[in-house]
Amino acid sequence: MKRRLAALVTHPIQYFKPIFQGLAADPEVELLVVYGCDHGLEASADPDFGVTFAWDSNPIEGFPSSFASRAPLQALSSTTGAWPIARQAAAQIQAFEPDSVLVFSYSPRFIQFTTLLLAQAGQTLWLRAETTDHALERSGVKGFVRDRVLKRWYGLFRHVFPIGTRSQQHYLRLGIPLEKQSLARYAVDVDFFAAQVAQWTPQRQQLRRELQIQPEDHVLLYVGKISPVKNPLLLPQALAHLKADPRLNSIVVVVVGDGELREALETELEAVIPGRWRGMGFQNQQQLGRFYALADTLVLPSIQGETWGLVVNEAQQFGLNVICSDKVGSSVDLVEPSERGRVHRSGDAADFARSIAELCTSSAVASPGTEHLPHPQQLVGQVLNQLKDLPENCG
């Protein structure tokens, strides 16, 4: 008899697609993915990027799914908006009669309400969430309260799937033993990006010419939301520390993304490296590869909230160097100081500048590859193992 697995997710997310496809492909599994809303399928406003867009590749292809609502993404965070959507999601999952429910994240309100409804109904629950103790700094009182709340929350779940080393340490600190954990490091759709590598890497020099970037220039690439938690303004501050360094004359900054700090970032870059930066705005999935292909080093100076940083996976698949702050979760798993990686102290422009100077001596990138990178199938395998170990009629 097939095992039935339900997954609960806020909205369609590109990075989850290969996970659900892998689970659905197993002949011993019947899968249903329940989304709170359809954000990203149709053009809609994204509050973080500050632009209106729809994904240019289908994030729900290749597996069964349903939607609890067609409400805007923001409705999932408000109590009044999330409650009716949660009831609908819980009803859809209950009707599916799963053996277990894999819950992605522990927020927003929609996820919390639905999880509580499912727990009340006696469902077996598993958790895959962006958990860490390093992404945010909290006062003693806030930290104490958070720990108490999370300990009780994690008690609802039979098993958890940490996204990385720091995530696993977080669970251990809060009393979840290793036997209730299955580590599967956060992964991107490596097959999708392998196709991007094959498409764009041979065009590297042409792509650079289109942006008037010389072959000998060293391109620093920023990809993502241009928001305070990402601390993008630390980049021009770091470059200012290199004013007397002749290597600054070979640096070009390419910024891919949008957000509330875009204008400020572009203004400060122009002041420090006039004419040697390119603002590309928001780019959809199919176009990201062109910018990784022309770049040399990814920079990710986040100051808080960066539980992993999937752009690190993407950049390394293209063979780029990576410089990130110590607040980035993947720094421990993927970037620890090496020939092609540096980790700087969060918020420290001088330390960031030293990392840039150390890695900008060459415009050569490594051979693209995925051998050392996390793969979505690792999580698929861990989930399947747990499914097969479940006793009969445990849902």
Feature names for model-found ranges:
Residues E263-Q283:
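Nucleotide-activated donor-binding/catalytic signature segment of Leloir-type glycosyltransferases, i.e.
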Residues V343, T361-G395:
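A charged, aromatic-enriched C-terminal amphipathic alpha-helix characteristic of glycosyltransferases
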Residues A293-T307, L320:
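Acidic donor-binding loop of glycosyltransferase active sites
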Residues K142-G143, L150, G155-Q205:
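Donor nucleotide-sugar binding/catalytic pocket of nucleotide-sugar-dependent glycosyltransferases
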Residues V312, N321-S325:
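Short hydrophobic beta-strand element within catalytic cores of glycosyltransferases
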Residues F104, P108-F110, A121-G143, L156-H159:
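A short, histidine- and acid-enriched strand-loop-helix "catalytic/donor-clamping" loop
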Residues Q214-K230, P236-L239:
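Conserved donor-binding/catalytic core segment of Leloir-type glycosyltransferases
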Residues F282-Q283, F291-A295:
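Short alpha-helical donor nucleotide-sugar binding micro-motif in glycosyltransferases
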